[in-house]
Amino acid sequence: MSRVCIPDSEYVERRKKCVEMMKEQNLDVMIVNGTESDYANPRYFCGFWPLFERVGVAIAANGNAAVMVGPESVIFAGDVSRIKNIYPCLYYREGANPSYPEIKTNTYNDVIEDLGVKGKKIRIGIGGYMETTVVMMDGLKECYPEAEIVNADNIMVSLRQIKSANEIACIREGFRIAQIATDEVIKALRPGVTELQMVGVAQKAIYENGAEYEGLPMYVFSEKSTSHAISRPSYRVIEKGDIVQLNLSAKVDGYSPAIGLPVGMGKYSPEKKDLVDFCLEAHKWTEKQLKAGVLASDIAKGFLKFFEDNGRRQNYVYGPCHGTGIIEVEAPWMETTSDYLLQPNMTFQVDTFVSGPTFGLRWEKGIVITENGFESNCDELKYIELDF
């Protein structure tokens, strides 16, 4: 069965582009780290997503590359990684901190020297700086005490922010599946079910229709928990009159888009309808600003002003959009301090969230920037008040 995915040739091109940027910044080697929960940067280069353990990708300025994993992931990584040089390293072991006394492991010295990088006074860039643990950084400094170690996240953002045709195809396939899950949950919603039961409906739908995993922990929240910007579903029983927030997602070859919308369990009360309508209006305002060449901070500042002009400053939490791709929330965000211009084939979640004292809501969809505006990656969001 054919499936939507990133071809092996694209992984090779990614490493080549990375090497070009490394040379511009005089880097001898780049170490790109990730975890099970935030795997995006190393998976971008090798296609491997760890569990329990961590993962690192080492790329030398000469183009050679290797994958570093915990001792239990060597065979797993060897089977799925597009980079076939696999090194077991204790820096990447699981949090239980086993010592694995019977297993021969490698150090950063072993890996970097095998890639052809000689000497101790080298310049090392770190990609996935926030995902780099103290254990990883301490190990690198111990192996290379004379090295200059710098944050190289700017390289990762530059590489990942403009999407290829294959990446956009993966994102759109994820949206197709997430839409099916959304429709199935809406069909199943009724007074008396729990939030977690509805998560089960969504999970069944995404796996039956081709997802490798959920793109984010499925959001099915009701009433007070809808005021949480991020949260987890619970055993709460959904009742008539509730507002229910859905944010459902599907991962396709790592790419993890999400669809978010509120659902009324009956007609909204005047208070709820007022905030639901304002949030949708803010969402549509954002869409009108999106096109190549626009300064991201101008959109974010205008978005905040839209809240203030409508007397809604107290409901504002964060800016209007964030990047999406090989993880649901990725750089760049659109914030009042953002100094970049929108470019064609940037992909964003238009993520419009408002929070009140007793409830909140989110309208969220995915788009790709074009020269004259944007293309939607999913169906138009529906205004839903269920009838019971």
Where would I find each of the regions flagged by the language model?
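Active-site neighborhoods and metal-handling regions in enzymes and metal-associated proteins
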Residues: 1-388
